[in-house]
Amino acid sequence: MKAINIHYLPVFMLLFSTSCFAQKNEKAVQQSSFFTKTDAENWVYVLKDKTVAASDVFKMDEGILQITGISSGYLRTKKSYTDFELVTEWRWTKTVGNSGVLVHIQPNDTVWPQCYQVQQKASDAGDIICMNGLWAKECTDSVKFTVKKMQPSNEKPLGEWNLIKVISKNKTLKVFVNGVLQNNITGLTASSGFIGFQNEGKPLEFRNLSIKILNKN
């Protein structure tokens, strides 16, 4: 009996260790739900026209964020993020226009903030703009702070949902549009900050937002 116990002890320890490792990783990539009515209070709203009510521009219900296009500005998380994977869908509802996912937004909210803008402008989705003094290795004067997407535009027609994924990891940003890797910038001068969604005057919607916190390694 002792021999049998000794024989199975390493197997037991391996299973226990594997289980703990899986639980640790599962916790590290836990998803969160957004854009419900109760979620509206978890965001900071920044508008160029201070006379406009944020509730007239940004509307949340049943997991969908509606941006009406009034004035210009953005909403951002109250929480700061460093290494993460963001996935969301967006579509233009009346006519195509300009918008973006803002990542690593720095404090002192203004229109426009220090951040990296992942473009959603029609025909340019996947470009990355280094805004107001933030830099990356690829954001040079010669490209005028805009790192163009790698592949031809692959956005869907007006009214159809597009999928965008942004991965922030170890001072790099990767951007996928509808499953295609469109950008990869490195050497970020800001590797943490708030996450936001831009309003630039045209109605659009976002849905199915998830943000996974990634392990540091």
Model-derived features with residue positions:
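Bacterial Sec-dependent N-terminal signal peptides
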Residues: M1-K27
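Carbohydrate-interacting regions of secretory-pathway proteins
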Residues: Q23-N217
